[in-house]
């Protein structure tokens, strides 16, 4: 009996212990599941927060982009509004001041024909109003509201050389004497004017270069443009020959006006014989217009108004047909002959044109200089180019003496017309 009670008691204890252990395990499992659920919910919450942050960032970027577009559209709208306002403003009448009457009144000749006595706006400085000035007039009251700049021919502005030619004095051979004279007349007065002041003389104003075609007249002018800091204006004589009356003379006047404004400056007139030929009695309408242009050129070169630091270089291969008026001192103070080079000059020119060429050892420049008697600088350059073409034709990267012989033979065959020697200076002044 006692044993059975003992067994029953032990079983109850074990059952109770098992029940408690089961409860503990169940609580642990419940806690673990709860933690897992909480962790899962936390991860889901973080994912939602990250997604919302990404959407917020995207919306902020879109907002900034829209703000930029809005700002750009506002700017364009403002520009268009201003343009519309300008288009609504009535046009102004252009007139020319004829006379000044009092402080705030001027006589103006309008572009439509009649002249008016008009008032001057307080926004315009009366000192800027002088006879000949172009002004803007209000369409209704004809009040002077603005002063226009001087009218200039765009063709004169286009003749100004912005980029300097890549030619220096060392690139010219056989013309040492001519280079010395041109530097004395052009460079020295511009760079060292005090030397002439000390001696008490006025520097020469102009140079005329004459000689056969291809002797280097234009090349000398290019070297002057490179070596000086002066404004260089290049004009071809035929550009001054115009169709309508007074157009050529007006262009000459504008060229010299531009040169004076940009002083120190150099005006180079190439092929000057196109407008400076001798004047004759037998004239057509075109000849008369050329003579008007010539007379304007003569007046600008040595007229009533001082020319200032403006130097003139003329070039021609027909000095015998030039008008004596343009050759007198005061217009062209020095008349420099640029002849065909002698043997020494031809050798120097050949050295200049072959210094970048890949020459064979058998090339003898002295012999080539002897073979090319009567050739000018342009023909010597053509010989060097032709010799290089002969080497390329033979698939070689160097030039031999035989290439030069063939080139000389080819160029000399083309030289059929002998260049006439220029007339003597005494004949020019008669």
From Swiss-Prot:
Which biological processes are named by the entry's GO terms?
Answer: proteasomal protein catabolic process; proteasome-mediated ubiquitin-dependent protein catabolic process; protein unfolding
Q: What is its main location?
A: cytoplasm
Docks into pockets in the proteasome alpha-ring to cause gate opening, as annotated region: 428-430
Q: What is the effect of changing residue 157 to G?
A: 4% of wild-type unfolding activity
Q: Name one Pfam family in it.
A: AAA
Q: Which superkingdom is the protein from?
A: Archaea
Can you tell me what the entry says about the temperature dependence of activity? Optimum temperature is 80 degrees Celsius for ATPase activity.
- Which cysteines does the record link by disulfide bonds? none
Result after altering residue 428 to A/V/F: Markedly decreased PAN's ability to stimulate gate opening
What is the stated purpose of this protein? ATPase which is responsible for recognizing, binding, unfolding and translocation of substrate proteins into the archaeal 20S proteasome core particle. Is essential for opening the gate of the 20S proteasome via an interaction with its C-terminus, thereby allowing substrate entry and access to the site of proteolysis. Thus, the C-termini of the proteasomal ATPase function like a 'key in a lock' to induce gate opening and therefore regulate proteolysis.
Q: How does it assemble?
A: Homohexamer. The hexameric complex has a two-ring architecture resembling a top hat that caps the 20S proteasome core at one or both ends. Alone, can form a complex composed of two stacked hexameric rings in vitro. Upon ATP-binding, the C-terminus of PAN interacts with the alpha-rings of the proteasome core by binding to the intersubunit pockets.
- Protein name, per record: Proteasome-activating nucleotidase
The encoding gene is pan
